[in-house]
Design a protein with these regions (language model features):
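Hydrophobic alpha-helical segments and helix pairs
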Residues: 83-139
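Flexible "stalk/tail and boundary" regions
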Residues: 42, 63-65, 80-81, 90, ...
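A short loop-to-beta-strand structural motif that recurs across blades of beta-propeller domains
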Residues: 36-38, 74-76, 125-128, 167-169, ...
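Conserved beta-strand positions in repeat-built beta-propeller and related beta-rich domains
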Residues: 22, 27-32, 68-73, 111-121, ...
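Short loop/turn segments immediately following beta-strands, especially the blade-tip
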Residues: 171-178, 277-282
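Blade-level signature of beta-propeller repeat domains, shared across WD40, Kelch, NHL, RCC1
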Residues: 240-290
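A short beta-strand motif characteristic of beta-propeller blades
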Residues: 3-9, 45-51, 86-93, 135-141, ...
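Beta-rich, blade/repeat-based domains predominating
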Residues: 10-24, 53-71, 94-110, 139-157, ...
Length: 290
């Protein structure tokens, strides 16, 4: 079985939201706490960084170029240079207590972004969707920390995780992609790690980065663990599929909340890893505006 390898000579603070661009042969990701979007062009190893004025929770590439970016206080459209062009909406949570976190697009090119509640043990976060006409809509509440967004290949299910509560949910979707009542897909026990960012493969299996769990796990459509890949760091944060055949897994990791001793012992924490796998991942749509 292949093992994860470091992709490039870079160590971040809280890398998340890895996003593959097949057209560019490039990997994008955010460093949330640094307020950055990174781009790494695999053929040339060129690494560039866009800096923003506040934390960047998640983003998606736009069909017409540039990004849709969920920052702490709101969601913006930018050009390809990261210049803010239009504010889509404010953060519907209290931005002093909850920042935007994980997100992405569905097959219809709509953008989703969830928040992460900061202080205390309180489910004050939510998940919202930006439709193609830029209308914002809150679609789920009662969340402590949103993560793990992915969609089944048949578009009948939306998957999310609530990281602090250690649970992955799945939510049925109707023909228009509107959500029904969510249900528990998998609950994690103490010591297993907690579900962070995720991706979906073409067989309908859900790949989850298990924060504090030292591993990436693949789950069947019924929630059974099928495979796991051990990581050389404690806290993987998210995965995405890419490469020419979509059989390369890119993995972000973090060194947030690690003391100096742990960082010295596991110096690759915060790195970006690459892992060849035997199944192709689902391709992600760009954000489509109409």
């Amino acid at each position: 079985m292949a093992e994860p390898q470091l992709l490039l000579n870079y160590i971040g603070h809280l890398p998340e939201c890895p996003t593959w661009s097949a057209e560019e042969h490039a990997l994008y990701w955010a460093d949330i706490l640094e307020g950055e979007i990174h781009r790494y062009h695999l053929p040339t190893a060129e690494h560039t960084v866009l800096s923003f004025h506040e934390e960047v929770g998640c983003f998606a590439l736009r069909e017409q170029g540039g990004f849709i970016v969920a920052m702490r206080t709101g969601i913006w459209l930018t050009d390809k240079h990261g210049l803010l062009r239009r504010k889509v909406c404010d953060n519907p949570s209290n931005p002093q207590l909850a920042r935007f976190n994980d997100g992405g697009t569905d097959s219809l090119g709509r953008f989703y972004a969830g928040t992460f509640w900061g202080p205390g043990d309180y489910n004050g976060a939510l998940l919202m969707r930006i439709d193609n006409d830029l209308t914002p809509k809150v679609i789920q509440c009662d969340i402590h920390g949103h993560n793990g967004l992915a969609f089944s290949p048949d578009n009948q299910w939306m998957f999310t995780s609530d990281t602090p509560n250690g649970v992955i949910y799945r939510t049925p979707l109707d023909e228009q992609g509107e959500p029904g009542r969510r249900e528990v897909f998998r609950q994690f026990k103490e010591g297993e790690g907690i579900p962070d960012g995720a991706a979906m493969d073409v067989e309908g299996c859900y790949w989850s980065a298990l924060f504090d769990g030292w591993r990436i796990a693949r789950f069947s459509p019924q929630g059974e663990q099928l495979e796991e890949y051990r990581m050389p760091v404690r806290c993987p944060t998210m995965v995405c599929f890419g490469g020419d055949d979509m059989k390369t897994l890119f993995i972000t990791t973090t060194r947030e909340n690690m003391d100096a001793d742990e960082v010295a012992k596991y110096p690759l924490s915060g790195g970006i890893f690459i892992l060849p796998v035997n199944v192709a991942g689902m391709k992600k749509s760009r954000f489509i505006e109409r």
